Amino acid sequence: MAKSKFERTKPHVNVGTIGHVDHGKTTLTAAITTVLSSKFGGEAKAYDQIDAAPEEKARGITINTAHVEYETANRHYAHVDCPGHADYVKNMITGAAQMDGAILVVSAADGPMPQTREHILLARQVGVPYIIVFLNKCDMVDDAELLELVEMEVRELLSKYDFPGDDTPIIKGSAKLALEGDKGELGEGAILKLAEALDTYIPTPERAVDGAFLMPVEDVFSISGRGTVVTGRVERGIIKVGEEIEIVGLKPTLKTTCTGVEMFRKLLDQGQAGDNVGILLRGTKREEVERGQVLCKPGSIKPHTHFTAEVYVLSKDEGGRHTPFFNNYRPQFYFRTTDVTGAIELPKDKEMVMPGDNVSITVKLIAPIAMEEGLRFAIREGGRTVGAGVVAKIIE
């Protein structure tokens, strides 16, 4: 069966469901596809199709994730749903499924639970910019005051982790009713309200090509008579011949000019996000540039050595460590294209970190890396991956 061509007529947004186990994330995911497919086209997915999420590997870590797609009047959405709590932790930290916004599912019958809190914290740490709340199972709560109380609790919890709790859209409904075809305001009505909230509350994400130019350096060659060529894949933005660029990371920042862009042995006037290119640098010596640095628009990204991060430590079964690690553990941190050694400082209340844990840490690298909050990295020991992380806050 031929795959239908992906029509990119509507802007594309990535979302996902988060929240405590059994609060109805997967049922809601099924309900959204069912209601929206009948209204705007697309494919309805049954609960068990989503629940049997296939295994994927991201940075060597096995994650179960279900991917569904749906459309609203204005947009095309790609939506991820994970069966288990551990899958969420891994997914959010590795950035396997980058989210432009999340739908936090909270059971009105139970209120916020430990994983509700943990997922909000994770969303904050890994830089999920927007959260919309679906207050599920409202058909099981007769008491309007109780509903108000749960809503208030959720808003307070969001505010506690620096999300705008007072302004967050909270949609009351029942995913089960909607999935069963109930046309009332808790059923289909709630799903349509949720779709509207997604469209209006989550802004259309900036496309990679619109960002400030950034390219991780993969290789450096000198071509006699022409100068130094740096190769890599443009991560974001556009580079045009004649533009100034900076070389950032590992060594003091250098300024240079792009004098040529090559792709598949052809000369171009520009390279853009997604292109694998060679960039010719004016007056730069071969030994002044190395793998692990980045080429970027001047002033757009700075080198840092000291930061806090949220990390997931691989379990033994995933090929990770067999033993815990302690304060001042010094592994390699693999950023983009290179390893840099760094020392880990654990939180005051944590004596050690076990394989399979996730934890907030502070890291000091021995050499600076071009860094922004939200940058992903792997933690390695002798070339094998033992963890994955994301920069939460830059200290210096």
UniProtKB/Swiss-Prot annotation:
Its EC number is 3.6.5.3. Residues 81-84 are annotated as: G3. Gene3D superfamilies: P-loop containing nucleotide triphosphate hydrolases (3.40.50.300), Translation factors (2.40.30.10). It is found in: Cytoplasm. Residues 60-64 are annotated as: G2. Mg(2+) binds at residue 26. One of its GO terms (cellular component) is cytosol. This is Elongation factor Tu. It comes from Thiomonas delicata.
